[in-house]
Amino acid sequence: MDATSLATLWATIALIIFLGVAIYIKVPGLIAKALDARAARISSELDEARKLRDEAQQLLGQYKKKRKEAEQEAADIVAAAKREAEMLATEAHKKTEDYVIRRTALAEQKIGQAERDAVAEVRASAVDIAVEAARALLAAKVDVKAGADLFKASLADVKAKLN
């Protein structure tokens, strides 16, 4: 036997002794327990992860529902604001039209009064001019006493006709 074969023999014997001691002190059982414990821990973590995922899905559903409700509420608020704005605009338009109608009527009344005042003033001026012209004409043709009597009578006649 040469040295290499002897070394191989001793290595094989050492390996068999090592495996025998390992089996005797139950190393494979310890390794199996450790692997089983790790598998149980991983399984537990997976179950917990599933629970967390389910809770997250529920929360997501709730938040989606709340978001949808909030969007609907916002849309309702916007619609109500639009309706109120339209109502206010209509009311303001109506008030403006009423104001314009009142101001137009007032302006027409003032114009009518101004026209009546102008006509009365023109008539009064025309009467004054006619009276003055008649007085001047009669003064030239009639004596003073007869002219004064005629003037008074004419003046009374004109006043009676105008009033």
Curated annotation (Swiss-Prot):
Transmembrane segment boundaries: 5-25
One GO term describing the cellular component: plasma membrane
Keyword Repressor set for record: no
Record key words, sorted: ATP synthesis, Cell inner membrane, Cell membrane, CF(0), Hydrogen ion transport, Ion transport, Membrane, Transmembrane, Transmembrane helix, Transport
Signal peptide positions (record): none
Membrane topology value: Single-pass membrane protein
Localisation per UniProt entry: Cell inner membrane
GO molecular function, one term: proton-transporting ATPase activity, rotational mechanism
Pfam families: ATP-synt_B
Record's function text: F(1)F(0) ATP synthase produces ATP from ADP in the presence of a proton or sodium gradient. F-type ATPases consist of two structural domains, F(1) containing the extramembraneous catalytic core and F(0) containing the membrane proton channel, linked together by a central stalk and a peripheral stalk. During catalysis, ATP synthesis in the catalytic domain of F(1) is coupled via a rotary mechanism of the central stalk subunits to proton translocation.
Database matches in HAMAP family: ATP_synth_b_bprime
Subunit-level organization: F-type ATPases have 2 components, F(1) - the catalytic core - and F(0) - the membrane proton channel. F(1) has five subunits: alpha(3), beta(3), gamma(1), delta(1), epsilon(1). F(0) has three main subunits: a(1), b(2) and c(10-14). The alpha and beta chains form an alternating ring which encloses part of the gamma chain. F(1) is attached to F(0) by a central stalk formed by the gamma and epsilon chains, while a peripheral stalk is formed by the delta and b chains.
Similarity-based family: Belongs to the ATPase B chain family.
Protein name stated in the entry: ATP synthase subunit b 2
